[in-house]
């Protein structure tokens, strides 16, 4: 089962000139045009594969690990990732619209919307059997929705070519309007729902979009929009497919030797070959890093996991071992990155592909996996119901893999207290704090500035003396009586007395 990208057609133009009385007639062989491109199932498959190629683009595409990719765009806004390269404006959030780093994903991906629209229109005109057309059209509709959702979450609603006539016969003077968020949402949910209904749970060729992959993007949209009930129902639909499962070993999820495992829902496939692989480790490794497998690997010493984030991992968390704080150099020396002043650990979640040579690794880039479905469901349940055993059970499914054990929610909380305060302008706010302490011995107190009235001009102070065996849930919310047309915000700060 080789990579989809390898199936791309290479078009060679052979021109034969034949001498005739008074004229020369050119004959073009092997040229794909609108008259012969979508006439067979193989044509439809090739057209679909060409769109999958846009995910990777010779290993430097929008869904891999390169500059401006969705990976970098997502991680730069967190405290989980940094780079040693001179991306000062990008890392500090002070970029402008002239910065290629922040608009690279858009420039790569936005044209794919038009390509998908064109392909769908041509497939609909194809003489191929309807059932065959429906399957390929569903894949392309899903891909178009994938592209559009990721553009939407990174850039907001953007003008897109969704009209077949404009995709087939583009008008240089045509200017598509900027849709509203609601219009984007209607388009995404309609397209993903239709695609999911038409796609199989498992494709004959690994790497193609499945029912579960389409549903997962639908779930991501609902989570992004905080549509908790829709998210819960979609998560349950994915779970109900009875197809996906968690890998027992976290590291094996991303291993090049464990492709196609049942935790993976959608990936960008790769081979350890130039243009067909991923430079997963090349962005990370120092130049003198020695592969534990003896193969020659290159490193550009850029991506890092900041020490502040690395130190949040419990020493018993098995995932911590995938971020290397020290390594063996090609000279055989042990290099301590923290001691040497490096900005962070090596985030080698994807590991080193033992078959890799130079830059290119064969690890598939994981875009969606089943663990996210379980955590999304846990979050949706908590948003709908508050702290509940169902959410804890789902989280424990993940924790047990990392720690070998989970945590529990007592049947009867030993402590429950709430504080109701009247906001100004008839806005009601409710503060509640729940302590689940299985060992006892903890205490807490709170006070509110300005005569104990919680409003938009003061603060709530909570002090907790911890027994070390409990966990807390804190909720801050506004009731339906909030004034319409106004914006509210709540900032929560926590600190440990030992840090003060």
Task: Enumerate the predicted regions with their spans.
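Secreted extracellular polysaccharide-interacting domains
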Residues: 463-484
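Short carbohydrate-recognition loop motifs
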Residues: 446-468
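Short, surface-exposed recognition loops and adjoining beta-strand edges that mediate ligand/DNA contacts
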Residues: 35, 62-81, 158-164, 200-286, ...
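Extracellular carbohydrate-recognition regions
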Residues: 410-440
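Membrane-proximal, proline-rich intrinsically disordered regions
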Residues: 20-66
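Elongated scaffold/linker segments in the mid-to-C-terminal portions of large proteins
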Residues: 42-43, 48, 56-61, 77, ...
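Conserved small/polar residues in nucleotide/adenosyl-binding loops
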Residues: 493-499
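Conserved, well-structured interaction surfaces
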Residues: 45, 53-54, 59, 82-155, ...
């Amino acid at each position: 089962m080789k990579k989809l990208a390898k199936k791309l057609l290479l078009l060679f133009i052979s021109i034969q000139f034949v001498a005739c009385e008074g004229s020369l007639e050119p004959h073009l062989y092997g040229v794909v045009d609108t008259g012969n491109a979508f006439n067979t199932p193989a044509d439809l498959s090739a057209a679909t594969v060409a769109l999958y190629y846009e995910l990777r683009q010779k290993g430097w595409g929008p869904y891999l690990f390169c500059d401006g990719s969705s990976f970098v765009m997502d991680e730069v806004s967190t405290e989980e990732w940094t780079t040693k390269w001179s991306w000062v404006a990008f890392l500090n959030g002070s970029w402008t619209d002239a910065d290629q780093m922040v608009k690279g994903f858009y420039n790569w991906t936005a044209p794919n919307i038009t390509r998908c629209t064109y392909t769908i229109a041509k497939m609909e005109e194809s003489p191929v059997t309807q059932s065959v057309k429906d399957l390929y059209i569903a894949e392309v509709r899903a891909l178009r929705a994938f592209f559009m959702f990721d553009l939407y979450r990174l850039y907001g609603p953007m003008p897109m070519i969704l009209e077949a006539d404009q995709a087939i016969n583009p008008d240089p003077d045509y200017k598509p309007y900027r849709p509203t968020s609601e219009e984007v949402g209607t388009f995404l949910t309609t397209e993903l729902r239709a695609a999911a209904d038409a796609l199989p749970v498992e494709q004959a060729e690994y790497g193609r979009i499945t029912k579960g992959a389409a549903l997962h993007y639908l779930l991501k949209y609902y989570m992004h929009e905080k549509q908790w009930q829709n998210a819960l129902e979609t998560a349950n639909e994915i779970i109900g497919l009875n197809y996906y499962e968690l890998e027992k070993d976290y590291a094996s999820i991303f291993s090049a030797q464990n492709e196609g495992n049942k935790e993976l829902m959608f990936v960008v496939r790769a081979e350890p070959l130039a243009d067909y692989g991923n430079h997963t480790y090349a962005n990370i490794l120092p130049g003198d890093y020695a592969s534990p497998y003896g193969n020659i690997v290159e490193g550009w010493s850029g991506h890092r996991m900041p020490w502040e984030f690395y130190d949040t991992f419990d020493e018993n968390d098995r995932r911590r071992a995938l971020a290397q704080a020290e390594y063996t150099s090609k000279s055989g020396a042990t290099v301590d990155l923290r001691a040497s002043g490096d900005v962070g650990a090596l985030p080698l979640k994807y590991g080193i592909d033992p078959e890799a040579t130079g830059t290119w690794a064969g690890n598939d880039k994981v875009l969606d996996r089943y663990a996210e479905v379980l955590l999304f469901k846990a979050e949706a349940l908590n948003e709908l119901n508050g702290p509940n055993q169902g959410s804890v059970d789902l989280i424990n499914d993940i924790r047990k893999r990392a720690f070998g054990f989970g945590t529990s929610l007592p049947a009867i909380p030993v402590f429950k207290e709430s504080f109701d305060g009247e906001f100004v302008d008839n806005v009601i706010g409710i503060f509640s704090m729940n302590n689940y302490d299985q060992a006892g011995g903890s205490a807490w107190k709170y006070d509110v500035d300005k005569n104990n009235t919680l409003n938009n001009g003061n603060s709530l102070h909570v002090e907790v003396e911890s027994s070390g065996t409990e966990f807390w849930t804190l909720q801050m919310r506004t009731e339906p009586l909030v004034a319409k047309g106004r914006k509210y915000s709540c900032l929560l700060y926590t600190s440990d007395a030992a840090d003060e």
